[in-house]
């Protein structure tokens, strides 16, 4: 399971089409909290209420040179999850360190209703 996560951490991926809510997950390799947080995010997307919903996920490896801005911002705070309404950067809400399924789900629902 860890190996699959390591591969996906270097790329971004869209989980569902026609994104209305964008999740951006900031993490790095060899981070136990990041691995746990990724599992929580996966569990959220397995919920029936989010099937066929407009939600996307981008995974950002903050140790990648191209992501130096995010390293400076979050090197001591990962994992971090941004949840925002697509096209409205001011709507961004952040969850740092520990992610909980219900908290993420509630925030996605709130963004969808905006």
From Swiss-Prot:
The record's section on PANTHER family has:
GLUTAREDOXIN-LIKE PROTEIN C5ORF63 HOMOLOG (PTHR33558:SF1)
What family does the entry list? Answer: Belongs to the glutaredoxin family. YDR286C subfamily.
Q: Name one Pfam family in it.
A: Glrx-like
This protein is called what?
Answer: Glutaredoxin-like protein YDR286C
**Which UniProt keywords are given for this protein, alphabetically ordered?**
Disulfide bond, Electron transport, Transport
Which positions form S-S bridges?
31-34
């Amino acid at each position: 399971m860890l190996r699959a996560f390591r591969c996906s951490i270097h790329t971004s991926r869209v989980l569902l089409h026609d994104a209305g809510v964008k999740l951006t997950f900031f993490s790095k390799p060899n981070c136990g909290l990041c691995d746990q947080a990724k599992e929580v995010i996966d569990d959220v997307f397995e919920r029936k209420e989010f099937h066929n919903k407009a939600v996307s996920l981008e995974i950002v490896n903050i140790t990648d040179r191209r992501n130096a801005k995010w390293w400076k911002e979050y090197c001591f705070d990962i994992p971090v999850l941004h949840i925002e309404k697509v096209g409205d950067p001011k709507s961004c809400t952040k969850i740092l360190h520990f992610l909980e399924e219900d908290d993420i789900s509630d925030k996605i629902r709130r963004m969808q209703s905006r």
